[in-house]
Amino acid sequence: MRYFSGLTLALALLFFPPCTLHAQDLSPRAYLITPIHSNAVTLSYSFSDGNINFNGALPVSDAKGRYSVPIFAYYHSFNFFGRSANAAAALPYGVGNFHGTAADVPQHLYRSGLVDSFYRVSVNLRGGPAMPAREFVKWHQKVLLGVGLNVIAPTGQYDPTKLINWGANRWAFKPEFGYSQRWGNWILDGYAGGWFFTTNHEFWSHTSSYPGTRSQSQKPMASFEGHISYDFKPGVWISLDGNFWIGGRTSVAGIENPLTKQQNSRLGGTGAIRIAKHQSLKFSYSDGTYIRYGGNYQSVSVGWQYSWLGKPN
């Protein structure tokens, strides 16, 4: 039982902090602007499968995970003191199986439920004034600079008596700086930010072996992301994507485990194509290139988007 508890604890630390499903995300063209009053809804599905690297933190072998995450998302652009700005929200649902061998005993876990919701707001600082559609069609991008704030709210499924939960029972915040520059049909994007976490005050608590409560905390984690993309024609483009994040050591009941420090990177590609006036499809693939601690997954996703232009007030 001691090693099985260690396995489930490690899985909880690896997969279900708020940063986990989002720190590995690759999001090309996140700081491109759209006309004010633009709206979009997106339905997407992602599938991830791969190994789990414990970096010697636990005597666990053959640890693997496979999960699916359908997501509903909404996007809206607006005028913020003369600058282009936008806000987005995403509601994911997770279904996954996780297994490994601890003390020569195979173990298997299954979870299904709501994942913590994700929110983002960004504001252009240079190169992208707020514009209605009639002005936007005459505008040509050069250099864009912006700032953003990503927030993960504790709205996912969480049971403090279980170690594996889709929700993390805490908030996460990521302030970010974004850069985008166009050369003809090419666009270069770069983002830099950091994740900050509140404390989960009911981590694996109220159990028969531990009737009280204990806390889980996590150190900040730096995040860097870059993309280079090419436009074939309006609404049709591809990109090469990469990211790197470092930090995020975790502590349980005030005891820090230095082996849980993350120092990971992913590489992938994205493609988008417009299929109708208001509809488009997006496909993406990514894989871990260096995973010091955490899930080393291959991930594929497909999304359908419907967009429209709202009427000014």
Features from the language model and the residues they span:
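Residues on the lipid-exposed face of transmembrane beta-strands in outer-membrane beta-barrel proteins
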Residues: 43-45, 72-76, 119-125, 149, ...
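Outer membrane beta-barrel transmembrane domains
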Residues: 202, 209-313
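Surface-exposed strand-loop-strand hairpins of Gram-negative outer-membrane beta-barrel proteins
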Residues: 48-69, 106-107, 160-167
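Residues that define the transmembrane beta-barrel architecture of outer-membrane proteins
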Residues: 37, 64-70, 112-119, 143, ...
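Outer-membrane pore/translocation modules
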Residues: 94-217, 259
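Outer-membrane beta-barrel channels and translocator barrels
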Residues: 36, 48, 79-82, 126-128, ...
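Outer-membrane beta-barrel biogenesis signature
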Residues: 21-42, 61, 127-142, 309-313
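Transmembrane beta-barrel strands of outer-membrane/channel proteins
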Residues: 41-47, 87-95, 145-153, 190-196, ...
